[in-house]
Amino acid sequence: IGDVDLNFDDNGKIKNDYEVKGFIKNGKLKILKKNSINDLSFIFNLKDQEYQIKDLRGVYNKIELSSDSINIKKKEQEFLIEGELSNEKDNINIKVFNNLFGGDLLDTNIETINFASNNKYTFSLNRQFKINDLKLKSNINLYQLVYKNNLNNLKEYIPNINESIELKDHVLLIDYEKNKIDIVGEGKIILKDKIDILKYKIKKKNDQYNFDTKIYINENPILLNSILY
């Protein structure tokens, strides 16, 4: 449903000052080949070379998404997109999440992840619908993350460490762009059967990682001999 405001020149062609306003309810948008956003509703305002979407709601592979505002500008052979995207607390499929953002933002060693987030992003979209120059800033409330433990060196210091490491109730700030990611976070960590505290700063540039991590182990015993010698 929409309203259309058009003006014509002397030759009967539509002028560039047109404006189309309206809304879509319970729509469906196919993206990324086999995937789609369902139950899609939003308000739109279309002008020449500029498109604005407000109050968007939709479901992507059982992930409930919402956005207050998305701005799209057409520039030559591509679209420049800037907006905000949120999801409520939910269990997230890792492959689905990575496909949504066109990359490998989440490690596939993650077995379970449950979080709510607010994300601000910019990217360009070409005619083949390929995402380029993605920049993403996220505020995340991480309720649970279970990570398959392949950190064999920890077993030298913490006897009988779990096969999977669990994070709970973390608050994270993530700044992502191509070949670069910064993560700052803090929350609970479960290495065995008791809870300790983990604080961390992680920087990745290309294939190089820089970790600044502090773990406050008050509940789980560690082997000091392994550390000292």
Model-derived regions: residue spans:
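Membrane-proximal interfacial segments on either side of biological membranes
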Residues: 1-229
